[in-house]
């Protein structure tokens, strides 16, 4: 086998940026940042979502997102007034008295 073809597999500290939850897992993630966790120094990777903040695992229905697309949208359009819904208009067929509608033609 060729040497130096595979990335280095090592223990990496993953930190959930929304909850602060930390866990160590084997990974090939490359970083220069390090952090001390449980007395050992690990390379660190900051993630936006993990099992401690994902709605599937937490059971909550709301997703905590740090400045996501929804927040940007709400900031942009928060000053716009929402128009009142338009009332529905009912259109009825009005025929003069004594006239009947012709029956619909059947297709063959």
Curated annotation (Swiss-Prot):
It comes from the Bacteria. GO terms for biological process: translation. Disulfide bonds: none annotated. The keyword Acetylation does not apply. Residues 97-108 have a biased composition (Basic residues). Keywords: Ribonucleoprotein, Ribosomal protein. GO terms for molecular function: structural constituent of ribosome. Residues 86-108 are annotated as: Disordered. One of its GO terms (cellular component) is ribonucleoprotein complex. Pfam families: Ribosomal_L31. The keyword Magnesium does not apply. Belongs to the bacterial ribosomal protein bL31 family. Type B subfamily. Part of the 50S ribosomal subunit. This is Large ribosomal subunit protein bL31B. It comes from Chlamydia trachomatis serovar L2 (strain ATCC VR-902B / DSM 19102 / 434/Bu).
